Amino acid sequence: MLRRTVLGALASLAALAADSSFSAAARARTPAPANAEAYIIWPPDGAVISGGKLWVRMGLRNMGICPKGVDLPNVGHHHLIVDADLPPLDQEIPSDRNHLHYGAGETDARLELPPGKHTLQLLMGDYNHVPHDPPVYSKKITITVK
């Protein structure tokens, strides 16, 4: 009977550990200074870009930049959100074509976008790619590629 209870408890714990929503909720978020601010230096909001290739310059005030995996106070790394809304702010930031990770501590990036309107927004992530508490993100800007 005791063996069955222990095995049942272990199976329940394994299921909870595999559940990403439980894992994300169980992690404490990394604190950020209340006055931290992420911003896009270039391109400016409303810019018209010819050819689709552009550099994005990323800025940050009142925090430092460091590579992923470095767990120090008041630091993080940039994530650029392209043509999407902010992801859930209490979970790891996705890594896909709309959520670009700059885990080496980059502060500028080369993008190639198809013609049309596009939105860009920065979101800072901690050593585990989870937004800080409070989250540090830029204003969403819109650019047009000709």
Question: Where is each model-derived feature located?
Answer:
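N-terminal export leaders
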Residues: R3-L7
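Short, compositionally biased P/S/T/A/G/V-rich stretches that sit at domain boundaries
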Residues: R27-G51
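A glycine-anchored, Pro-Gly-centered beta-turn/N-cap motif
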Residues: G52, G76, P114-G116
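Short amphipathic, basic-aromatic surface patches that mediate peripheral association
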Residues: G59-V70
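Short coil-to-beta strand junction motifs in C2/discoidin
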Residues: V70-H78, Y137
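Short acidic/polar inter-strand loop motif in beta-rich domains
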Residues: P87-L89, G125-D133
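Short beta-strand elements
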Residues: P134-K146
